Amino acid sequence: MPTPTKGPRLGGGPAHEKLILANLATALFEHRSITTTEAKAKRLRPHAEKLISFAKKGDLASRRQVMKTIRDKSVVHFLFTEIGPAMAERNGGYTRIVKIGPRKGDNAPMAVIQLVMEPVSAKQGVVREAERAAAVSAPAADEVVVGDEAPAAESTDAAQVEAGGVEQPDTLPDADAPATADEGVEVDAAEVDPSDEKKDQA
């Protein structure tokens, strides 16, 4: 017994499903964007991306594989000459599905499936590198958290001082220390002054 495909079953049987997907892919490559139900769009996406991968290869065997699915030679030509080279820099993700409102008649969920024809920018590579760097620096962020815990300990000491649990000295040693050092330097300079020594001798 053959294994059924993943996702919803389209049409009456397997042959009908293949025809539906082939027609949807043909319309997608011809118009670059089509509106269909969400279920059909989700089933079409891997099928269309596989055909685009064949178009990126561009050899005769790939063209024959695509011709098995898409019977319109003009669409195959457009796929191999326009769409395939435009997707050369992109590694997957050739299509995009955008959900739109439900259909008026039967309230079926609708979606627009379209080809992603925008060129791959250098910014996308930079964003990927930044994400990798952020993942690598995640352990470094843990070290920063340890540094943040120290001010919290200092704040608890300040709270104890305010509560009267710890005695606080009357003078600040940092404020007095530079003044004492300056006075000591002046005193040493006065003691070494040779004019004072001559006056003392006379």
Swiss-Prot record:
GO terms for molecular function: structural constituent of ribosome. Residues 169-182 have a biased composition (Low complexity). Residues 148-202 are annotated as: Disordered. GO terms for cellular component: cytosolic large ribosomal subunit. InterPro entries: Ribosomal_bL17, Ribosomal_bL17_sf. Residues 183-194 have a biased composition (Acidic residues). It comes from the Bacteria. Gene3D superfamilies: Ribosomal protein L17 (3.90.1030.10). GO terms for biological process: translation. Keywords: Ribonucleoprotein, Ribosomal protein. The keyword Metal-binding does not apply. Belongs to the bacterial ribosomal protein bL17 family. PANTHER family: LARGE RIBOSOMAL SUBUNIT PROTEIN BL17M, RIBOSOMAL PROTEIN L17. Part of the 50S ribosomal subunit. Contacts protein L32. NCBIfam families: L17. This is Large ribosomal subunit protein bL17.
